Structures are given as structure tokens and as C-alpha cells.
């Protein structure tokens, strides 16, 4: 019998699990509003940027193809979480259950918000991976810090530009939307910069353990190929 070689390493699997956990956790934390002096944010900001850091690590070590796999896996698990949460929220509670309001606040994500979140996540994540991948080729693998920060700016920028108009247009004053977008991009980029030493250490250690340092010279970045993980 011929033994089939696995295409995914244990370490990549661990990265994938952490990526999915971060996305799902961010969904739950989004229901809490946090005040930071002169600006208000959602609790999801605490953990969501971690998904972009993992995206950067995955793209840097394993390349754009594995980054696409990571993104689609995260999207699928996030969708299942939201779908089952919405289903449980729609089913009437037991007569003695008196916490429907609290449960709905966490799992009753409005369809518009959910749709905006899914679209923004896909676009932002693919932009982040694309910028990271192309810059690695153009720089011959140098300047990881610069590439990680710039890919986050573009990725988070695309995410916010898509999410806030889709989710909040007509709900908040139109003039407030640019403020939401800019503040989210700035805060998430600052987050990336703060944890950059950790990101660099993780990337170096992962490359050493995996014996991988992918360059995407033969990758097709067309829209149709983005839908593939091959």
C-alpha cells in the first residue's frame, strides 16, 4: 500500500486553528463597545488583528497558496459559527430561560452586519496576502517588518472601506464613516507594530522548524485563482 504524504504540516494546522479561533472570538467580542478616551471601538479590535498577523506568517512561510487555504478555512468556520448561532437564537427558549435578550445580543448578529463582515474579511485578507506575497518577491525576501506593516495597512484599509459603508450606511451619519474607517486602520496598524517583535520571532522559528520559506514566483493572482487553494 502506498502511503499518501500529507500536504499540511502539524504546525500549519495549529496556525489554522488559532486563526479560526481568533475570527470566531472577534465575532463575540464585537458585541461589546469599549471607550478609549476620545474614541470608541468594539471588543473585536482586541483580537481581530491577530488574524492578520497569522495571515502574514502563513504567507511568509508557506506562500500565497497556503494563505488562501487559511483564509477560506477561516471564512468557512466563521460562517458555521454565525449560522448555528443565528439558528439557536431563532429557536424559542425554554419557559424557565430568562436570558434571551443577552443571548440575542451575542448571537443575533443582523444579516446586514454579518454579510458586510464576511465580504470585508475575504477582501481584506486576500489583499493582505497579495501585498505580502508580491512585496516578498520584489524585495527578495528582505524587510519583513516593512512588508508586514504595509500589508496590514492595505488589508485593514480594504476591510474597513468595505465593512463600514455596507454595515453602517444609513445607520450612522455619512460624515462619520471616514472617521470609523481611518480610526480602525490606524489602531489595527499600531497593534501590528506593537506586536511586530513577536511576529518576527514566530516567523523565524516557524521557518526553521518547517524548513520552508516560500516565494510565489509562479502564482497566478487573478480573481478566479483566488477562489482556489491549489
Locate each region found by the language model.
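Hydrophobic transmembrane alpha-helices
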Residues: 1-75, 79
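Interfacial helix-loop-helix junctions of multi-pass membrane proteins
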Residues: 165-175
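Short, highly charged, low-complexity non-transmembrane loops/tails of multi-pass membrane proteins
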Residues: 206-230
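Membrane-interface interhelical connector segments
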Residues: 88-112
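Membrane-helix cytosolic exit motif
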Residues: 190-211
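Transmembrane alpha-helix/helix-exit interface in multi-pass inner-membrane proteins
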Residues: 78-97, 121, 125
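Hydrophobic transmembrane alpha-helical segments of multi-pass transport and channel proteins
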Residues: 153, 157, 185-197
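Internal alpha-helical transmembrane segments of multi-pass membrane proteins
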Residues: 138-157
Amino acid at each position: 500500500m502506498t502511503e499518501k504524504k500529507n500536504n499540511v504540516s502539524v504546525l500549519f494546522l495549529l496556525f489554522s486553528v488559532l486563526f479560526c479561533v481568533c475570527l470566531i472570538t472577534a465575532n463575540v467580542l464585537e458585541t461589546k463597545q469599549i471607550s478609549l478616551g476620545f474614541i470608541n471601538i468594539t471588543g473585536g479590535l482586541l483580537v481581530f488583528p491577530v488574524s492578520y498577523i497569522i495571515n502574514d506568517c502563513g504567507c511568509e512561510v508557506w506562500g500565497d497558496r497556503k494563505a488562501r487555504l487559511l483564509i477560506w478555512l477561516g471564512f468557512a468556520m466563521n460562517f458555521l459559527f454565525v449560522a448555528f448561532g443565528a439558528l439557536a437564537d431563532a429557536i424559542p427558549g425554554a419557559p424557565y430561560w430568562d436570558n434571551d435578550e443577552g443571548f440575542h445580543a451575542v448571537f443575533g448578529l443582523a444579516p446586514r452586519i454579518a454579510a458586510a463582515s464576511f465580504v470585508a474579511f475575504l477582501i481584506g485578507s486576500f489583499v493582505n496576502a497579495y501585498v505580502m506575497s508580491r512585496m516578498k518577491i520584489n524585495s527578495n525576501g528582505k524587510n519583513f517588518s516593512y512588508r508586514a506593516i504595509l500589508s496590514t495597512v492595505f488589508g485593514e484599509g480594504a476591510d474597513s472601506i468595505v465593512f463600514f459603508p455596507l454595515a453602517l450606511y444609513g445607520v450612522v451619519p455619512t460624515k462619520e464613516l471616514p472617521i470609523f474607517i481611518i480610526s480602525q486602520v490606524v489602531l489595527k496598524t499600531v497593534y501590528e507594530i506593537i506586536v511586530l517583535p513577536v511576529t518576527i520571532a514566530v516567523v523565524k522559528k516557524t521557518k526553521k522548524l518547517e524548513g520552508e520559506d516560500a516565494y510565489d514566483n509562479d502564482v497566478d493572482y487573478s480573481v478566479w485563482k483566488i477562489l482556489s487553494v491549489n
